[in-house]
Amino acid sequence: NYERPENYDQMYNLILMTNKIASQPLNIDIDPIKHLLGSVKGQNFQRTLQRVRHVCDYNPWGTVTGRLAANPNSFPILTMSKEFRRCVRPNNDWLVELDFNAAELRTLLALAGQEQPKNDIHDWNVKNIFNSSMTRDEAKVKTFSWLYSSKENKDLERLYNKDFVRNKYWDGFKIKTDYGRIMDNVDEHHALNYIVQSTTIDMVHEQAYKVFKLLEGMKSNVAFLIHDAVYIDLANDERQAIVKMLDTFKKTPYGDFKVTVSAGKH
């Protein structure tokens, strides 16, 4: 008999959502990026546009940690340069981005047993870890250079507690996350990265699915996902739903995560 994996329900929901996304043609308009198409990079992107289908067709099994990959001939939403994203327009009226503030860092903080800061996490680090001795950008660089390296920083370790998190989810060979995702043959060098990235992306997908369900029966829909961010194709007469979407998205199993909301025509 086949035993259902612990994360079966979540993967089922993710496939439902990504299949629906793949059925929605993108509205591609090259006018906003015409000035970029003269470069070699721009010409290559234009050739890609002619070759691929204008849909976001994800592969949920494409990476060991659960990050989405793209199926062949999918629109390259995950890998295209940010400057070219302006060619993607909403089919309704607005593209709304819901983006977690420093999602992986917040996940690590939660796994270490700490409460979520309500404000920007890098500002919070400046005050609570670095005693206001550096700028936000300096704190961000210092934190991320420490996060996935062997560098020591007692102040960061005190709150983020990498060793505790690694030892809780990794047995020296295998990782099992809170979401029931299992990764085998993981060495110490990759263990923390896999734990944090995998837990974060499964949490993001779970929150995105809640927004997806919230929009059922509406004109607005989940247009696509880019790593830790969800993009909504929003109808103007449903714009009041943004408040509920934001409230739904930010309430994670690890506490309320700060979310940045932005909206535009592309």
Predicted segments with their positions:
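Conserved catalytic core of nucleotide polymerization and phosphodiester-bond processing enzymes
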Residues: 1-266
